[in-house]
Amino acid sequence: MEELQGYLEIDRSRQQDFLYPLLFQEYIYALAHDHSLNRSILYEPMENLGYDNKSSSLIVKRFITRMYQQNHLIISANDSNQNKFVGHNKNLDSQTISEGFAIIVEIPFSLRLVSSLEGLEGKGKEIVKSRNLRSIHSIFSFLEDKLSHLNYVSDILIPHPIHPEILVQVLRSWVQDAPSLHLLRLFLHEYRNWTSLITPKKSISIFSKENQRFFLFLYNFHICECESIFVFLRKQSSHLRSTSFRALLERTHFYGKMEHFVVVFRNNFQTILWLVKDPFMHYVRYQGKSFLASKGTPLLMNKWKYYLVNFWQYYFYLWSQPSRIHINQLSNHSLDFLGYLSSVRLNPSVVSSQMLENLYLMDIAIKKFDTIIPIIPLIGSLAKAKFCNVSGHPVSKPVRADSSDSDIIDRFGRICKNLSHYHSGSSKKKSLYRIKYILRLSCARTLARKHKSTVRAFLKRLGSELLEEFFTEEEQVLSLIFPRTSSPSRRLYRKQIWYLDIIRINDLANHE
């Protein structure tokens, strides 16, 4: 945001809606270049990100001029197969325009966010900024604190628009620049299979690297609109207000939307505000999959279910079937979420109480939030990546002839450490040890295959210590902080550990 403010000297009161001329500015594509290099630096090598040096604003200017001269903005269903828009430089043109357009179309949202932050600071309200809120594992900490007090949960698959024009019309309330909206229509017609990009069952990673930022913006904006009802109802309900609410919504640009829905939907939703009078109502989402948990009754959950279906259909023209929302009782249901199976289990315990000469034994059941690794889907992901077969038997992976042993070991070790780091919150470590065993033996088979030997002969010749270095147990890492001699540390090794530096789901763990 500081970069945008430095480059863009825009009068917010009059010029923030005129975005189309910015397509012809050199610094827009410089920003797009910087964002493309920084977006996945923690997970992908720099050489895999890449950037086409032939892309420049000069090509964009010539391309847009040619597009208007040949009247390519008018696209009908009859000539969709003979679209001259792409020409012979389809990848270059679409990548360059979409990267710049993705930067530009975010400007109104960023400016509204800054205005909201400045307004809150002027009123003396403190905005809590913490990078820990970005961590996926922070969701499990929230669930561990809240779900043990709730009874029912609804699994919700957020619907996707059936026509691209719906998304354009919704975006029109934020961006009032007609040429920019026409250009958006052009992109959506160009990517005719765009609806598959925001299907809830698909991962964000399916977006092509060339247009990832553009489609990520469309996806996040679509989700933001679908969730707007929760923002309004939570603000209106006196029982659901909290000081941390604004901090949690900081990165999703809900500040302007909160004020907007208070004005627009006040009259329409006043009669249904009683639905959220229960203070034990919580909503969690990642990508297109979300959960709505409550301490209420099945009748209340069913009313929420049909209300959401009608709301999405009436206000956003999103076709959603009631069968896409499943209501389950937490005591006998596991949430398949973010690579974990989460559930609330009763942990029985016996408490003895002595009063004078009488001894009383009381059976007490305490609710406990439990997370385990779904071993079968994870083995399926490993089999798909050619680390093992479908039954979990490790196999060797084909490698390049010029790959060194250290490169192969580093690759397997990095995958093993990432999985161990991500699944450190599992309450049962046996499944995690099995995954480590598969990766370890697959690495040994790969090295033996390269040297045209057997695994036993290879390890006997070089020593089993060759593979010990990178398969570091979680306990060994924790021992650097907590000494093993203390009894609390031994219990710590068996407990769930949540890290606050994980900002996306592991690719192998994303088996949905």
From Swiss-Prot:
Belongs to the intron maturase 2 family. MatK subfamily. This is Maturase K. Usually encoded in the trnK tRNA gene intron. Probably assists in splicing its own and other chloroplast group II introns. It comes from the Eukaryota. The keyword Methyltransferase does not apply. GO terms for molecular function: RNA binding. The gene is matK. The keyword tRNA processing applies. One of its GO terms (cellular component) is chloroplast. Keywords: Chloroplast, mRNA processing, Plastid, RNA-binding, tRNA processing. It is found in: Plastid, Chloroplast. One of its GO terms (biological process) is RNA splicing.
